[in-house]
Amino acid sequence: LALTCGLIGLPLVGKTTLFNLLTCAGAETSNFAGRTKTNVHTAGIPDARLDFLAGLYHPRKYTPAALEVIDVPGLSRGSGAAFLAAVREVDALIHVVRAFRSDTVLHVEENLNPARDLENVDAELILADLQVVETRLERITAGKKIKGETLVEQAALQRCQATLEAGQPLREADLAGEEWQAVRSLGFLTVKPALVVVNIDEDQLHQSSYPFEAELQQYASARNIPVLTICAQVETEIASLEADERSSFLEAMEIAEPGINRVAQAMYSRLGLISFLTAGEDEVRAWTIRAGTPARTAAGKVHSDIERGFIRAEVVNYDDLARLGDLGKVKEKGLARLEGKEYIVQDGDIINFRFNV
């Protein structure tokens, strides 16, 4: 699945720092607005289950699930067209907003208000979608006769128009299945799954609060957008440490896990993706599929021959393996099971496909 997440927001909010944390790409950051270059790189999705399997099998190769991440240049005056064009190319949106204070990194709006900044970026996306809706409605009404599929599309567009004019993204629009199909090709921006990441400073991290938090949470909640906080400055320090030092640092800071892990996992989830796992001495690997994928289709992710010659999927629940610590013990207790081609693969299933070609 070649799916992409776009980091969007105003300039100087920490998008490129977050991009580097997700991808280890080492893209250049700066203390001034005006970047026009789009950064693109792959981000591995942290998965403790895969780490456990690696400890069990000591494989020659370790392959986590991955997503492509695009660092879109910040939305600034005069950059609207380029910004919107870049947003059209991604499958999901991560709105990065700034709550951190800094004397060296100026805010483009001169004062901090992450709720306002989020709303302003959203407004650009809503306005762009509204223009698409209005243009298409004008073309439909200019036609001689409106019937059949066009009638369905017109009704869908009118619902979309009402949603957008109310300041809501189209992912919240109340459209029937056939109505979504009728407008799918229009490439709406506010249909894309979204996530908000608030970049806070170290003091705010310790205080567990930031300015305008209630307003931002209220705005996001009304639009069913999850909100995560991350202190990119601290996360950069964490990323620079060796594994043993990292554990001590996290414990001293009273952080359960690096915030960047939560962001990566949330990106994956917002795209409706899950992972099934394969494990052995050669490789432990997380395979990316959409939630609801049947076993035979999942087998095709590993190899087309396995899908073609699919017989059964030998499935082990990760929690059972983690609890018992040994695949042999899982089988002894009758907890390994054989599933057919229609079995819906669950997140974290450890699968060995039986096939014949």
What kind of feature is each model-predicted range?
Residues L1-L106, D122, V133-T135:
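Conserved G1/Walker A P-loop phosphate-binding module
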Residues E68, G80-S185, V196, L228:
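Long, charged N-terminal accessory/stalk domains
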